Curated annotation (Swiss-Prot):
PANTHER family: RNA-BINDING PROTEIN HFQ. GO terms for molecular function: RNA binding. It comes from the Bacteria. GO terms for biological process: regulation of DNA-templated transcription; regulation of RNA stability; regulation of translation, ncRNA-mediated. It comes from Cellvibrio japonicus (strain Ueda107). This is RNA-binding protein Hfq. Residues 9-68 form the Sm domain. Gene3D superfamilies: 2.30.30.100. RNA chaperone that binds small regulatory RNA (sRNAs) and mRNAs to facilitate mRNA translational regulation in response to envelope stress, environmental stress and changes in metabolite concentrations. Also binds with high specificity to tRNAs. InterPro entries: Hfq (IPR005001), LSM_dom_sf (IPR010920), Sm (IPR047575). Transmembrane segments: none annotated. Belongs to the Hfq family. GO terms for cellular component: cytosol. Homohexamer.
Length: 88
């Protein structure tokens, strides 16, 4: 995992695993709502009544509906290795 993704991937992974409803604001101001179904280096799959593939470069802000705890990289069972669990 590159340094640029050391927070992004664990954060999205917690949102995905805990099925936290999120609001995603795009750079053009559009608000999307749903749950993070999956993600990779370039896109986030957002599920609501339909699944939408949203390109990360178009995302301005991700707002969860509740507080989430992101594991630190040095914690046991932390973000390292959880990347493989994205396709549930």
């Amino acid at each position: 995992m590159s340094k640029g993704h050391s927070l992004q991937d664990p954060y999205l992974n917690v949102l995905r695993k805990e099925r936290v409803p999120v609001s995603i604001y795009l750079v053009n101001g559009i608000k999307l709502q749903g749950q993070v179904e999956s993600f990779d280096q370039f896109v986030v799959l957002l599920k609501n009544t339909v699944s939408q593939m949203v390109y990360k470069h178009a995302i301005s802000t991700v707002v969860p509906s509740r507080a989430v705890r992101v594991p630190l990289l040095n914690e046991a069972g932390g973000a390292e290795g959880e990347e493989d669990e994205q396709a549930e």
